[in-house]
Amino acid sequence: MATINQLVRKGRKRRVAKSNVPALEASPQKRGVCTRVYTTTPKKPNSALRKVARVRLTNNYEVSSYIGGEGHNLQEHSVVLIRGGRVKDLPGVRYHVVRGAADTAGVDKRRQGRSKYGAKRPKS
């Protein structure tokens, strides 16, 4: 415990908050180009083939980013928009591809939660 005299001399140190999404550099989204599109398997106890893209951003960071939704049209050299948000069962994947922005198509035949997958309103 610090004495009052020590606190007068030094003061308390502020804790520095560490970002979970450093590659965004305090932006809401960043644009990038896919360098590799592949599937990978999640950690135990889950089992699937998760779709992931390796993306080279405009600020020269290279990050892994998850492609949500059923089916996608991404390949190497596709331009994508990424946002923050990690995937808990894929280590090292801390970003999501924004569906329906840049070269990424929205999920077709999507009826609920459409805004999260870039799907237009169906013609009833």
From Swiss-Prot:
An MF annotation (GO) of this entry: rRNA binding
Q: Give Gene Ontology CC terms.
A: small ribosomal subunit
**What's a Pfam family this protein contains?**
Ribosom_S12_S23
Stretch list, region Disordered: 1-29, 101-124
Spell out the Basic residues composition-biased ranges: 111-124
Q: Return the InterPro entries for the record.
A: NA-bd_OB-fold (IPR012340), Ribosomal_uS12 (IPR006032), Ribosomal_uS12_bac (IPR005679)
Which PROSITE patterns does the entry mention? RIBOSOMAL_S12
Which keywords has UniProt assigned to this entry?
Methylation, Ribonucleoprotein, Ribosomal protein, RNA-binding, rRNA-binding, tRNA-binding
NCBIfam families noted in UniProt: rpsL_bact
Family designation: Belongs to the universal ribosomal protein uS12 family.
Subunit annotation: Part of the 30S ribosomal subunit. Contacts proteins S8 and S17. May interact with IF1 in the 30S initiation complex.
Report what the protein is called.
Small ribosomal subunit protein uS12
Q: Which organism is it from?
A: Alkalilimnicola ehrlichii (strain ATCC BAA-1101 / DSM 17681 / MLHE-1)
Q: Which lineage?
A: Bacteria, Pseudomonadati, Pseudomonadota, Gammaproteobacteria, Chromatiales
